[in-house]
Amino acid sequence: IEKNIRLINIESIDELERVNKVALNQNKKINIGIRLNPNIDGLTIDKISTGKKTDKFGIDTDKLNELFQVLDVSKNVNLIGISCHVGSQIFNINVFAEIFQKMKANAQIFLDIGYDIKHVDLGGGLGVSYSQDQVLLSLELIKNEINKCFVNVPYKLSFEPGRYLVANAGILVTTIITIKNNGGINYLITDAGMHTLIRP
């Protein structure tokens, strides 16, 4: 808030109240975005799934009425966008189609109530191939789904390509130090670890 960044993304109604209070104490009105939890299964590894109702991220879309009540009395914030992110390593085009449809519908709810939504962040999660059985989604398919869903909308769209841009830009080279056997399973002990290439 002190640095006047473009916006602060809000993850919960409680956080909205706290951010509004801090802005009030600093006599500022700040731009915020709301991260929604659209209850979409990214059909990915459970540990990197972030958009189901039971996941910890975002505000459940079933709580929009409660959110609007708090927004109405939060005079030191200015809502300018919404976002979501349902996970990483998504290889199914139908997941993206569902994200786009739900985010468009949610944006329309905010617009109909009178919020001046200037941007909608569609998240990311495009899968990258770490093995031969993982077939990459065509960017053309993603583009076609976006073009089909978002026609003449009054806001800008953003997408988070993340590791899709850089995952294949390098390799991890490590040395096997020893082989450890636990319970009949061989484990290769290397001089690299999770801190070197964090993956679930």
Segment roles from a protein language model:
Residues 1-119:
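Active-site-proximal beta-alpha core segment in soluble small-molecule metabolic enzymes
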Residues 86-200:
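C-terminal active-site-proximal or functional interface alpha/beta core segments in diverse enzymes
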